[in-house]
Amino acid sequence: VTIGTEGMESRDPALVKGETVTLQGKQAEIFVRYRDIRVDHSALYRMDQQQQYIKGFFEAVQKHSVKDSGLVVRLFDRVQEYMVTNMAKDQYLKVAMDAVGSGKLSDEDFYTVPGEGVVTPRYDEFYADKEALTPILLELFYREIE
């Protein structure tokens, strides 16, 4: 990933804005969790970091799974104890394998809830635009009955 946020170097000296870094272990956790609470709406910037990480991780899995067909299964085996799902293992592995073969993730694969950020004396607040959100929810979660 390319570090796009000021101040991460306070958590890890390698995470300097503008530098491109291959994240490993604790560094990856720092990258996806970091936010500077002194900066307004830093939670929104953190979501950008998380999307950047997901895209990079997905690309790496795609690249390495070409040479290692068992990679996706091993990744799920490692995270299984942290998962909660009502899907059978063969079902979620099929979804994952289909995703890995589907091409690159882009910004269009992510949704941000439309709305307005407001800074208050105590917290950053976000108010969803319910009218603008409705078409997104319908597109993602509903299918018209024929």
Residue ranges of model-derived segments:
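Flexible, polar/acidic helix-loop-strand segments at domain edges
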Residues: 1-71
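Second-shell loop/turn segments in exported
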Residues: 17, 36-45, 61-66, 78-87, ...
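C-terminal solvent-exposed extensions
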Residues: 19-23, 28, 82-146
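Solvent-exposed, polar/charged alpha-helical surfaces in well-ordered, non-transmembrane soluble domains
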Residues: 30, 52-59, 70-77, 81, ...
